Regions:
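Extended acidic, low-complexity intrinsically disordered regions
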Residues: 1-215
C-alpha cells in the first residue's frame, strides 16, 4: 500500500468495523486521488494494469481507480507465493497481457434510434462528453456494459444498435470497426428468456446490486 507522497494511504480497516454497516465503506475509494490521476493519464493515452500479490490490507478499492479510468485491468493474487499455482497464474496473466493483440488511443460510441438512449455506462474507461468512451488501450478482454432506456413507443419491428470503435493497431494504422445489431422487439416474455445470455445477465445484476448497496 502506498505509504509516501501525495498518494499515501492510511490503514482504514479495523476489527471493530467488520460485520457492521461501516464495513461497506471499505469497498469504496478512500480518496478520489487515484481516479483523478487515472483521468489525467487518459489525456496522455496511458493505461495502467496492476498485478498485486499483497498478503495484508492494500486498499484495493482506492488504488484500482487507476485501472478503472484508464481501461486497465487489476489482477489480485491473495497471499501470493512465488511457487505453485499463483506463480503460474501471474506468469500466464503477464504473458497474455503483453502478447495479445491490442489497440491504442481508442474511442468508442454506441448509437441507438430516436426514442431511446444509453442511460448508464459501466466498465473501465473515461467518459468524454455524454456518450464517448475513451480507452488508451483496448483488446479482446475489454468489456463494457450499457443500459438503454426507452423514452417513447417504438413502432419498428427491430431495435437497431450500432457501435463504432476508432483505434490505432499495433502497426500504427488508424482503424475504425463498426458493429451493427438489429434486435427483434417482442411483447412475449418467453421470447426474451429463450434468447437471453444468462451468464451476462447474472454478472450485470451482481454488479448493479453491489453498486446500489454501496451507494
Amino acid at each position: 500500500m502506498p505509504s509516501y507522497g501525495s498518494g499515501k494511504l492510511k490503514l482504514r480497516e479495523t476489527p471493530a468495523m467488520l460485520g457492521t454497516e461501516a464495513e461497506k465503506d471499505l469497498l469504496c475509494p478512500g480518496t478520489p486521488l487515484y481516479h483523478e490521476l487515472g483521468v489525467a493519464l487518459v489525456e496522455k493515452q496511458i493505461s495502467v494494469d496492476f498485478f498485486l500479490g499483497a498478503a495484508q490490507y492494500a486498499d484495493l478499492p482506492t488504488i484500482s481507480g487507476l485501472c478503472d479510468a484508464t481501461g486497465g485491468q487489476f489482477f489480485y493474487y491473495p497471499s501470493f507465493h512465488s511457487e505453485g499455482p499463483q506463480a503460474e497464474a501471474l506468469f500466464g496473466d503477464i504473458y497474455h497481457d503483453l502478447t495479445r493483440e491490442t489497440g491504442f488511443e481508442a474511442v468508442y460510441r454506441v448509437r441507438v434510434p430516436q426514442g431511446a438512449k444509453v442511460s448508464m455506462f459501466h466498465g473501465n474507461f473515461t467518459l468524454s462528453n455524454t456518450d464517448l468512451m475513451v480507452l488508451p488501450v483496448c483488446h479482446a478482454d475489454t468489456t463494457v456494459v450499457l443500459e438503454f432506456s426507452i423514452e417513447s413507443v417504438l413502432s419498428m419491428p427491430c431495435f437497431p444498435i450500432q457501435g463504432a470503435l476508432l483505434y490505432t493497431n499495433s502497426r500504427g494504422e488508424r482503424r475504425i470497426r463498426v458493429h451493427t445489431l438489429s434486435i427483434p422487439i417482442s411483447n412475449i416474455l418467453s421470447h426474451l428468456f429463450e434468447r437471453v445470455n444468462q451468464d451476462v445477465i447474472t454478472a450485470i445484476t451482481l454488479h448493479q446490486g453491489m453498486n446500489r448497496h454501496l451507494d
